[in-house]
């Protein structure tokens, strides 16, 4: 998949930031020699910090580790090869030496550091929306583009439905039907009343999931409902590591009691699409695929172009005009300035 080309200034900034990071690593990193380490073993990254990561071994034990300088990137969910130290040094118990190939990853564009992976090896993205202040189908569509491009199954969750009167609920269900019609799964839930929380919990038991959505939609309430001991677990890990408590900006993978894993990633609150080109965004709309390539002109912009098969499908009721309009809003946003094109969900 082709990626948007960075400008010379962006490239220079990325190189400068990388150099500064390497310098910091040299100052803080422990030099692990071979005789200081045990045998290689498999593990999963459950938390990533600036120069450390917490790795869970096959027995469920968590160790804080350094990263080899040869590792280009490391995120929560990565499957790794690591070695435990014969003794703990400065609160660090071992070193990560290699990363297994990822099945998939979620990344967000960063103007200064390029495309930054957030999490890897995900089975399902839970797109959380809420009825208040307003339901934004445009934001849902942005997340769905990411899901389609990454090849990750989405679940659209509408939270706080307990705030809806029956008539309002019917209106919301009618709006969301455009997603059901093209094969997306939707769940109307309430963390407060417990409506459909059992169904959500059952779906989360199937693999590894990550929650995404705007601030205020109730992601934290959902996580606390599903995993009420989450804060206690964070505290326990900090005490065990001896390195003190990290801020809540760190992503973390949690094991759910009923099975499955949940990644809580505050970094997912900011989500831009400016690293994608128009062709990639078009491929992110699954219902467009059966008409693409059938337009009269190869360079069709799918607007007022004569013989546009996509526009004709909208006029015939085969494609939702709401989704079609949101698609063009996304395409138009690609040409916006830096301050405008960084899509913030905070």
UniProtKB/Swiss-Prot annotation:
Recorded GO CC terms: cytoplasm
Region (Disordered): 1-25
Comp. bias regions, Polar residues: 7-20
UniProt keywords, alphabetically: Cytoplasm, GTP-binding, Hydrolase, Metal-binding, Nucleotide-binding, Ribosome biogenesis, RNA-binding, rRNA-binding, Zinc
A Pfam family hit: RsgA_GTPase
Catalytic class of the enzyme: hydrolase
Binding site for GTP: 159-162, 213-221
Cofactor annotation remark: Binds 1 zinc ion per subunit.
Any GO MF annotation of the entry: metal ion binding
PROSITE patterns (UniProt xref): ENGC_GTPASE, G_CP
Residue intervals of the CP-type G domain: 103-271
A biological process term (GO) from this entry: ribosomal small subunit biogenesis
Binding locations of Zn(2+): 295, 300, 302, 308
EC id: 3.6.1.-
Top-rank taxon: Bacteria
Cofactor(s) the record lists: Zn(2+)
S-S bridge residues: none
UniProt keyword annotation of Cytoplasm present: yes
Location in or out of the cell: Cytoplasm
Function (record text): One of several proteins that assist in the late maturation steps of the functional core of the 30S ribosomal subunit. Helps release RbfA from mature subunits. May play a role in the assembly of ribosomal proteins into the subunit. Circularly permuted GTPase that catalyzes slow GTP hydrolysis, GTPase activity is stimulated by the 30S ribosomal subunit.
PANTHER family registered for this protein in UniProt: SMALL RIBOSOMAL SUBUNIT BIOGENESIS GTPASE RSGA, SMALL RIBOSOMAL SUBUNIT BIOGENESIS GTPASE RSGA 1, MITOCHONDRIAL-RELATED
Subunit structure: Monomer. Associates with 30S ribosomal subunit, binds 16S rRNA.
Family designation: Belongs to the TRAFAC class YlqF/YawG GTPase family. RsgA subfamily.
Protein name, UniProt field: Small ribosomal subunit biogenesis GTPase RsgA
Provenance organism: Haemophilus influenzae (strain ATCC 51907 / DSM 11121 / KW20 / Rd)
Gene that produces this protein: rsgA
């Amino acid at each position: 998949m082709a990626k948007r080309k960075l400008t010379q200034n962006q490239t220079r900034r990325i190189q400068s930031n990388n150099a500064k990071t390497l310098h910091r690593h040299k100052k803080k990193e422990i030099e692990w020699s071979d005789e200081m380490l045990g045998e290689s073993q498999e593990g999963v990254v459950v938390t990533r910090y600036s120069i450390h990561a917490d790795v869970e071994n096959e027995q469920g034990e968590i160790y804080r580790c350094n990263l080899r300088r040869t590792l280009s990137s490391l995120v929560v969910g990565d499957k790794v090869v690591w070695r435990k130290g014969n003794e703990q040094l400065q609160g660090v118990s071992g070193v990560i030496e290699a990363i297994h190939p990822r099945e998939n990853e979620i990344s967000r564009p960063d103007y200064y550091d390029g495309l930054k992976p957030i999490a890897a090896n995900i089975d399902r993205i839970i797109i959380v929306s809420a009825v208040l202040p307003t339901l934004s189908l445009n934001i849902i569509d942005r997340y769905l583009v990411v899901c389609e491009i990454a090849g990750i199954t989405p679940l659209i969750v509408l939270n706080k439905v307990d705030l809806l009167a029956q008539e309002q609920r019917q209106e919301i269900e009618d709006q969301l039907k455009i997603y059901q019609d093209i094969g997306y799964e939707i769940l109307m839930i309430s963390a407060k009343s417990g409506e459909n929380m059992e169904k959500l919990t059952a779906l989360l038991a199937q693999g590894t999931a990550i929650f995404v959505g705007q601030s205020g939609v109730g992601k934290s309430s959902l996580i606390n409902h599903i995993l009420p001991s989450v804060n206690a677990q964070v505290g326990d890990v900090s005490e065990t590591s001896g390195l003190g408590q990290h801020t809540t900006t760190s992503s973390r993978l949690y094991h759910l009691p009923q099975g499955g894993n949940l990644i809580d990633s505050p970094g997912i609150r900011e989500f831009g699409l400016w690293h994608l080109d128009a062709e990639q965004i078009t491929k992110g709309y699954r219902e467009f695929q059966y008409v693409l390539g059938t337009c009269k002109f190869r360079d069709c912009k799918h607007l007022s172009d004569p013989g546009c098969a996509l526009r004709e499908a909208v006029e015939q009721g085969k494609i939702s005009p709401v989704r079609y309009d949101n698609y063009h809003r996304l395409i138009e946003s690609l040409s916006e300035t830096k301050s405008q094109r960084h899509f913030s969900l905070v």
